[in-house]
Regions:
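A short glycine-rich, Lys/Arg-flanked "PGG" loop and its adjoining helix->strand segment in the class I
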Residues: 136-151
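Conserved class I S-adenosyl-L-methionine
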Residues: 1-52, 65, 151-163
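Class I SAM-dependent methyltransferase SAM/SAH-binding core
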Residues: 55-111
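A short His-aromatic
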Residues: 130-131
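A short acidic, Gly/Pro-enriched loop at the edge of an enzyme's catalytic core
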Residues: 113-122
Length: 163
């Protein structure tokens, strides 16, 4: 896709519309999360291992549940998302739960201009990469942020799930 600006704008509006709906849904189970339940499943936890003290960049963090679950595991977390409403909710959750986390609202393609750090780990999960018009460019963003020997941890659904 040569000009993704309208695509990005529409995508942002869509995700802004979904934030409060998602936060109120049983799928995200905010009550359990607020009481300390991790949103990370067995597969993700096995892939992550011990992340205590590691710097983690969570791309497409939505409203920060997984980011804050990573923080509960001892990681130093930065979450990035296109939706300004999601980032606002992530910041509110971090404050409410007294958890450390930095949240940046940005077009992920532009993240290297806004986040001046390298990370031990880049994490993204479920329904994230299907929204990008240029996966090669997205992969370049991931590579940009990884320290030498850093890892990308990615868990996602097969696209057929949504058909």
């Amino acid at each position: 896709m040569k000009d993704a600006s309208n695509y990005i704008k529409l995508n942002k509006a869509t995700w802004n519309d979904k934030v409060d709906v998602h936060m109120a849904s049983s799928f995200y189970d905010m009550e359990a999360f607020l009481q300390g339940k991790s949103t990370l499943n067995e597969i993700e936890l096995a892939l992550l291992g011990d992340i205590s003290g590691k710097k983690v960049l969570h791309l497409q963090c939505h409203f920060g549940q997984d980011s804050l679950s990573l923080a509960r595991m001892g990681a130093q977390v930065t979450g990035a998302d296109l939706s300004d409403k999601a980032i606002q909710r992530a910041q509110e959750l971090a404050e409410k739960l007294n958890l450390e986390g930095t949240f940046v609202c940005c077009d992920i393609y532009e993240a290297p201009k806004l986040i001046d750090e390298k990370f031990d780990l880049v994490f993204t999960s479920y329904g994230t990469i299907g929204w990008f018009p240029d996966l090669e460019r997205w992969a370049g963003v991931v590579a940009h942020f990884l320290k030498p020997n850093g890892q990308l941890i990615m868990a996602d659904f097969h696209p057929v799930v949504w058909m």
